[in-house]
Swiss-Prot record:
Domain of life: Bacteria
Cellular localization per UniProt: Cytoplasm
Gene that this sequence comes from: groES
Segments traversing the membrane: none
One CC-aspect GO term: cytoplasm
This protein's name: Co-chaperonin GroES
Keyword Metal-binding among record annotations: no
Amino acid sequence: MAAVSINVTTVKPLGDRVFVKVSPSEEKTAGGIFLPDAAKEKPQIGEVVAVGPGKRNDDGSRTPVEVGVGDKVLYSKYAGTDIKLGGEEFVLLSEKDILAAVS
């Protein structure tokens, strides 16, 4: 079996899935206290790096995904599958787990 090299550019989401680069969480509180990793909340904001072709309808057509590459999104706290690539954190989400686009 040949080895497969996986990086951000080789990930192509299927269906209505969205591949998101997780924004880093806060390192310290407003009062200046540094937070240990165990005390940090799981991030819920990230930047879309790839989108699938959309959900397939009963008639065979597709409903396109409402967000695009480069959009910042807010997603459900425990949604998706966490993935680490090249030292960076990503999450693979279903479109239904995206709550809003953030400007």
